[in-house]
Amino acid sequence: MIKSEAVHCTALTKGEKFLHNKISYEIYSEAGTYHKQHGIENQDAVRVGCSNDTNCFYCCMSDGASFCPKAENVAWCTVDNAEKVLRKESISSINENDGKRIAKEIVLKIRSSLYQYAIKNDLEFEKLCSTLIIFYINLETKEYMIIHIGDGLVGNIDEENSVEMLSFPQNGITPRYTYFCNNNNVFKKSLRIYFGKIKKNSSVIVATDGVYEQSNIFNILPKQIKQTKHC
C-alpha cells in the first residue's frame, strides 16, 4: 500500500515493514495452498526502490506460472529486469509518452533476458511465463503510472477505507487463464498502461492473484477488493 505524505505501500509479498525515502511500505509473501500441499516454492517476486530521481518510487511485482519450469527464477528475472530500467529513470512529470517508452523498454528487456535464460538452461522460451505489475509514483506530485500484464491488481484505498480499483486482473476464457510477459502478442493484447494522481492521505495496494487465497491478508482488505471480479 502506498500512502500520500508519508506514502505507505503494501506490496503483498514478504511480511516485513520498511521506511524508504518518504514512503513506508509493507511486503508480505506466502506460498498458496496448492503449492504448500505439493512442496512447491513461493513463485512471487517483488522489488521496491527509488529511481535516480529519488522523488520517484517504484514497486515491481511478478508471479511465475505454476506450470512454468523454474517459476520462481522466472519471476525474479522479470522484476530484476524491470527494476534495471526503472532505477535509471528520472521523470519529473509522468506522461503517456514516457509511460509507453518505459513499458516497451521493460518488456523487451524482460523478454530478452528470459530468452537467454531459456537457451542457457535448455528450456522452451514459450514456457517461461510470468505476470508483471509495476506501480511507479512521483512522491511530490503524487502522479502515478501502472504497467500491468496478466492478473493481480492495484487499488487505491482512501481514509474511509473505500477502494478505487486502478488496475484489474486480466484473465481469458476462464479465471485461471491469464496473460504473460513472454506472449507473442504482448504489446497488442496484454500490456496495459494507466496514469493518474493519488489523493492526499490515501494508500495503494499492489498484489498478485494470491491475495484472494491468503485469508490472513484477505480478511483485512476492504470489501471492494474482495468483490473484485476477474475481467
Regions found by a protein language model. Give the residues of each.
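PP2C/PPM-type serine/threonine phosphatase catalytic domain
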Residues: 2-231
